[in-house]
């Protein structure tokens, strides 16, 4: 059966200096990239917090670390990112929709200025609804930065999306949606709601639970609507 695949990484926290949050985020991301370039995959998606402080220098450093990646690069903003600077360096990679055969990945922006938690504005929900209405894909994946369900872990859920009900009010109208992906919580987890997979991507920097490794998610999308997730660790 025909399939396509893509890799999701998240929360790279690349800074002007190599160390952020007590770990060498530069070296850690390089290890992850070295593993990804040996995978036969169609795209690399970064689901926010590309950098730690959103400086132009850190985005340029990230660009250098990502240089070996020869596949399509897709990025969305996280609460640590500064959109003007992100846009300056990664304008070609910021996306709202991306098609892989019968599948489409649609992003929505949950970032609030100067706040750690997420919120989807009326405008953002309207845009998401419009993109869903327009989609001719058979199957859809949604990606945003913030968690949309309680993480059932040491993670502080008050730092997640503040208005998940408003999001579900939009998404529940579209049975084509197979999964919702996010980062922010620095941990790998999988949930399910009304038959839709809800997937948290680990961080390339460090995890906030007792997992000491760094990791990423590799998704395979089949033409019959099946989706498999392979979380890989280093």
Curated annotation (Swiss-Prot):
One matching Pfam family: Metallophos
Cofactor requirement: Fe(2+)
InterPro entries given in the database record: Calcineurin-like_PHP_ApaH (IPR004843), CNP_phosphodiesterase-III (IPR050884), Metallo-depent_PP-like (IPR029052)
Record's keyword annotation contains S-adenosyl-L-methionine: no
Positions contributing to Fe cation 2 binding: 49, 79, 145, 184
Enzyme class: hydrolase
Superkingdom of source: Bacteria
Family under the similarity heading: Belongs to the cyclic nucleotide phosphodiesterase class-III family.
Single GO MF descriptor: 3',5'-cyclic-AMP phosphodiesterase activity
Protein name: Probable cyclic nucleotide phosphodiesterase Rmag_0669
Keywords: Hydrolase, Iron, Metal-binding, Nucleotide-binding
Presence of keyword rRNA-binding: no
Binding site for AMP: 13, 49, 79-80, 186
Positions contributing to Fe cation 1 binding: 11, 13, 49, 186
Cofactor descriptive note: Binds 2 Fe(2+) ions per subunit.
Enzyme nomenclature, EC number: 3.1.4.-
């Amino acid at each position: 059966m025909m399939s396509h695949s893509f890799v999701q990484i998240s929360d790279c926290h690349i800074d002007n200096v190599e160390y952020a949050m007590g770990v060498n985020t530069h070296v850690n991301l390089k290890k992850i990239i070295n593993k990804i370039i040996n995978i036969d995959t169609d795209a690399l998606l970064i689901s926010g917090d590309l950098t730690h402080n959103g400086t132009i220098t850190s985005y340029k450093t990230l660009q250098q670390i990502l240089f070996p990646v020869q596949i399509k690069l897709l990025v969305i903003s996280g609460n640590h990112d500064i959109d003007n600077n992100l846009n300056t360096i990664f304008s070609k990679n910021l996306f709202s929709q991306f098609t892989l055969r019968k599948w489409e990945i649609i992003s929505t922006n949950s970032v609030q200025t100067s706040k750690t938690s997420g919120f989807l504005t009326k405008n953002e929900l309207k845009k998401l609804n419009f993109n869903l209405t327009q989609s001719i894909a058979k199957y859809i994946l949604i990606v945003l930065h913030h968690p949309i369900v309680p993480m059932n872990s040491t993670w502080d859920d008050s730092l997640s999306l503040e208005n998940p009900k408003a999001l579900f009010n939009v998404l529940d109208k579209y049975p084509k949606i197979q999964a919702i992906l996010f980062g922010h919580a620095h941990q790998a987890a999988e949930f399910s709601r009304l038959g839709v997979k809800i997937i948290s991507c680990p961080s390339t920097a460090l995890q906030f639970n007792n997992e000491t490794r760094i990791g990423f998610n590799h998704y395979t999308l089949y033409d019959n609507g099946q989706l498999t997730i392979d979380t890989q660790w280093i």
